[in-house]
């Protein structure tokens, strides 16, 4: 049966990628249909109840700057907010929030149902309709066909999904939801390179059975941060604490004893899991020298007693899960409400995608999220927004858009995927970016909102707020440049042991000094109106203070390009290179690249690692030059 209404764009899947894709397409005026197996799980947080973190928070801010929903929904659902790396430089500071699962789903659904040009339908997609190598629509499990000019697949872990608990396994997209088996078979028939990946989740624990008295409390930050550039703290629900505990040697012995029934260690699971979110059994085996691992006990919401024990993801048998949980301090009497499990699923080599996230082999078919080999809500949402945007641009017969690596972490993410591919689930880190000093959380709107407005992603309300903020920043910078401080006034900031300074300085020049912040600066001068808005004040201070560093980083990237063809020694032992992570060392020793350029294109090799390689090579060349000179001098002496 053919559905009478034709659509411009159909989005398949209602997770973080699918909801952002559907909202983006509809915001751009496309008649959009979002198909999902269950309308009650739109925006579901399938694993951890948190948004943001290092690299991930940057993506959330960029999604927000382009008009996306994730940041605003988190502000309405966040029950604890923290700034990670707050003592470090602004490039690596990152917002992270614990979210109430129910409130987050509700916030996303409100936005979907309020969005013009967007319809929702609960139905499972089993097949794709093609005319030659062009997508024309989809077919559901009820035999209903829907026509569209573009289709965005955001199917998460549902393609051929198999869940594992010990020796038991069953088909599932996640616990409680069926896998997409027919659609997986259909995609495998196409000229696409397919592989299997794996992820996992920990058992959930009833908070009423936890002894919090002996645990370490982890409260949120004060003042409470916000995620969205349009957000404020009045949107936040009640704030609560998380808690910390640790595994111990008894825990590890229980895990080691149970490995003979672990699907990870008995060959049942073939998919590769996320390196940076390993299961507890992986941690115990790979880091056998460690006698403890930290566990964060994270509330799943305000109206539930369930706790997410972040750090003990596992697919061990349920009886082993109970034993290992109860071996941990504070959890001796813990009741598990849901067992942990691992899940294997299909993904497709993202190198078969264009930067628009359209497949190269099927015209009008876009992929976003875990189908491309990524892991994480934030990575999925960023891809979804970009896929929805580019599907819309394609229908409008306009050029596709993807930010470059120096414009956004979204650009870094997509460039890494489509040029390097993945061998394991891809997670965003700030270390993956060459330009991270200018790709900060605080300036995501300055980098992207104007483009988003031009493309039709950004609302008039957001644009007006952005324009006012941008003007306020430039006005304040001008005031700082034109306001000069006399030596007498400057002495107020000096300590008794500092020598007297008889020169005058502009406030702009003073703000460049690492020991002087914007707040101290404002107290020096009553001339002109200082900034009240904290976002504007923060932006001004960072822009001024790091101006020189950003310029130097740009020059460093130019130098990297010049080193592209630098030859690496054959059979080089990368363990000798100081500062390289275990991951980077392992991959370089495995691939043995011939040049710096080849090394840079290996999946997982970061710009920071390339810098360390260059330093190592330069030191080696310097030592060789000294030896040659010594030999030359020695030869002259003998003669």
From Swiss-Prot:
**A Gene Ontology MF term for this entry?**
flavin adenine dinucleotide binding
Keyword entries, A-Z: Cytoplasm, FAD, Flavoprotein, NAD, tRNA processing
Which amino acids does the record list as binding FAD? 13-18, 125, 180, 370
Read off the PROSITE patterns from this record.
GIDA_1, GIDA_2
Q: What is its main location?
A: cytoplasm
**Highest taxon of the source?**
Bacteria
Which amino acid positions bind NAD(+), per UniProt?
273-287
Q: Which Pfam families match?
A: GIDA (PF01134), GIDA_C_1st (PF21680), SAM_GIDA_C (PF13932)
InterPro entries, alphabetized: FAD/NAD-bd_sf, GIDA_C_N, MnmG, MnmG-rel, MnmG-rel_CS, MnmG_C, MnmG_C_subdom, MnmG_C_subdom_sf
Q: Where in the cell is it found?
A: Cytoplasm
* Any one GO biological process: tRNA methylation
What cellular-component terms does GO give this entry?
A: cytosol
The cofactors named for this UniProt entry are: FAD
Family stated for the protein in its record: Belongs to the MnmG family.
Q: How does it assemble?
A: Homodimer. Heterotetramer of two MnmE and two MnmG subunits.
Q: What does this protein do?
A: NAD-binding protein involved in the addition of a carboxymethylaminomethyl (cmnm) group at the wobble position (U34) of certain tRNAs, forming tRNA-cmnm(5)s(2)U34.
Would you tell me the protein name for this molecule? tRNA uridine 5-carboxymethylaminomethyl modification enzyme MnmG
Q: Which organism is it from?
A: Nitrosomonas europaea (strain ATCC 19718 / CIP 103999 / KCTC 2705 / NBRC 14298)
């Amino acid at each position: 049966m053919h559905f009478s209404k034709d659509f411009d764009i159909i989005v398949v899947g209602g997770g973080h990628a699918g909801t952002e894709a559907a909202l983006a397409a509809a915001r751009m005026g496309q008649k959009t249909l979002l198909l999902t197996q269950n309308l009650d799980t739109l925006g579901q947080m399938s694993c951890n109840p948190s948004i943001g973190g290092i690299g991930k928070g940057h993506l959330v801010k960029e999604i927000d700057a382009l008009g996306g929903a994730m940041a605003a929904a988190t502000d309405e659902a966040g029950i604890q907010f923290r700034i990670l790396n707050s003592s470090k430089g602004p490039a690596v500071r990152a917002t992270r929030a614990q979210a109430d699962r129910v409130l987050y789903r509700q916030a996303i659904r409100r936005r979907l149902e309020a969005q013009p040009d967007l319809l929702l339908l609960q139905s499972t997609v089993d097949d794709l309709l093609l005319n030659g190598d062009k997508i024309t629509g989809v077919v559901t499990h009820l035999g209903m066909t829907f026509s569209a000019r573009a289709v965005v697949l955001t199917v998460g872990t549902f393609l051929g999904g198999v869940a594992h608990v010990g020796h038991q396994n069953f088909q599932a997209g996640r616990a409680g939801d069926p896998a997409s088996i027919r659609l997986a078979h259909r995609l495998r028939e196409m000229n696409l390179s397919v592989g299997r990946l794996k992820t996992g989740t920990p058992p959930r624990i009833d908070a009423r059975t936890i002894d919090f008295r002996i645990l370490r409390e982890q409260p949120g930050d004060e003042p409470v941060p916000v995620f969205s550039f349009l957000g404020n703290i009045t949107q936040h629900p009640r704030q609560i604490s998380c808690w910390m505990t640790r595994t111990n040697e008894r825990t590890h012995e229980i895990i080691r004893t149970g490995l003979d029934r672990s699907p990870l260690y008995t060959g049942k699971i073939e998919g590769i899991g996320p390196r940076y979110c390993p299961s507890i059994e992986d941690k115990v085996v790979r880091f056998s020298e460690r006698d403890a691992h930290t566990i964060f006990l994270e509330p799943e919401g305000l109206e539930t007693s369930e706790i997410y024990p972040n750090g003990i993801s596992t697919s061990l048998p349920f009886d082993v899960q109970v034993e290992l949980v109860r071996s941990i301090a504070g959890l001796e009497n813990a009741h598990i409400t849901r067992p942990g499990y691992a899940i294997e699923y299909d993904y497709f080599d993202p190198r078969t995608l264009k930067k628009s996230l359209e497949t190269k082999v099927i015209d009008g078919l876009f992929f976003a999220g875990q189908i491309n080999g990524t892991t994480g809500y934030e990575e999925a949402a960023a891809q979804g927004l970009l896929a929805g945007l580019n599907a819309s641009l394609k229908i409008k017969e306009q050029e596709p858009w993807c930010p470059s690596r120096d414009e956004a972490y979204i650009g870094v993410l997509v460039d890494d995927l489509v040029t390097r591919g993945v061998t394991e689930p891809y997670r965003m880190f700030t270390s993956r970016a060459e330009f991270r000093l200018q790709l900060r959380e605080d300036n995501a709107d300055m980098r992207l909102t104007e483009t988003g407005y031009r493309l039709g992603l950004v609302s008039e309300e957001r644009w007006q707020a952005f324009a006012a903020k941008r003007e306020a920043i430039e006005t304040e910078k001008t005031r700082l440049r034109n306001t000069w401080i006399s030596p007498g006034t400057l002495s107020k900031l000096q300590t008794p042991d500092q020598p007297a300074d008889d020169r005058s300085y502009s406030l702009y020049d003073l703000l460049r000094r690492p020991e002087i912040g914007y707040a101290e600066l404002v107290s020096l001068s009553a001339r002109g109106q200082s900034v009240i808005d904290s976002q504007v004040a923060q932006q001004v201070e960072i822009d001024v203070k790091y101006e020189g560093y950003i310029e130097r980083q740009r020059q460093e990237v130019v130098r990297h390009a010049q080193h592209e063809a630098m030859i690496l020694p054959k059979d080089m032992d990368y363990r000798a290179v100081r500062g390289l992570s275990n991951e980077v060392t392992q991959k370089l020793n495995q691939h043995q690249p011939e040049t710096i350029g080849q090394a840079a294109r290996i999946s997982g090799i970061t710009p920071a690692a390339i810098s360390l390689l260059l330093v190592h090579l330069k030191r080696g060349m310097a030592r060789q030059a000294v030896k040659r000179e010594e030999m030359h001098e020695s030869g002259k002496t003998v003669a």
